[in-house]
Amino acid sequence: MKSKFNSYTFYVDSTQQTINFDSLDEVNEYVCDITGVSQNQVVIVDDVEEKGHSNVTVKDKFGDKMRVVGFVYGSRW
């Protein structure tokens, strides 16, 4: 599925930084790097393509607790 966005901006809650990425996969990899979780523990809601934004959450190793680590939104520029 082709994305309707050219780039994605990720706002990191802990550092209050914004970082630009070319794809949601890159956002996912970055979240793994900064949190130490595996890719299947990162949750970026699929409705980014519809709504244009989503919270980014990570699951703990048991999958029962989730915490928000930031916010991502798409850009057409």
Model-derived features with residue positions:
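Short, mixed-charge low-complexity intrinsically disordered segments
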Residues: V37-W77
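A short, charged, amphipathic alpha-helix used as a generic interaction element across diverse proteins
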Residues: D22-Q41
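Polar/charged side chains located within well-ordered beta-strands of beta-rich proteins
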Residues: S7-T9, N20, N28
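Short, mixed charged/polar active-site loops
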Residues: Q16-T18, K65-M66
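Generic structural motif
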Residues: D13-T15, L24, D47-V48, K61
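Generic detection of short hydrophobic beta-strand segments and adjacent strand-loop junctions
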Residues: S3, Q17-F21, V56
